[in-house]
Amino acid sequence: MRTTLLLLIIAITVMVFVSEAYAAPAPEPILKQGTIESLTR
């Protein structure tokens, strides 16, 4: 029960961060692209 609640909290937090990232216009698209490239590399 406790682990399920923890996972739910994590999922909500991640969704909030993702929605904020998509809602806010990227001030530095080049920096964002570089971050994605470094993550996928």
UniProtKB/Swiss-Prot annotation:
Its main location: secreted. The keyword Signal applies. One of its GO terms (molecular function) is toxin activity. It is found in: Secreted. Keywords: Secreted, Signal, Toxin. Residues 1-29 form the signal peptide. One of its GO terms (cellular component) is extracellular region. Expressed by the venom apparatus. Belongs to the caterpillar 11 family. Probable toxin. This is U-megalopygitoxin(11)-Mo28. The lineage of its organism: Eukaryota, Metazoa, Ecdysozoa, Arthropoda, Hexapoda.
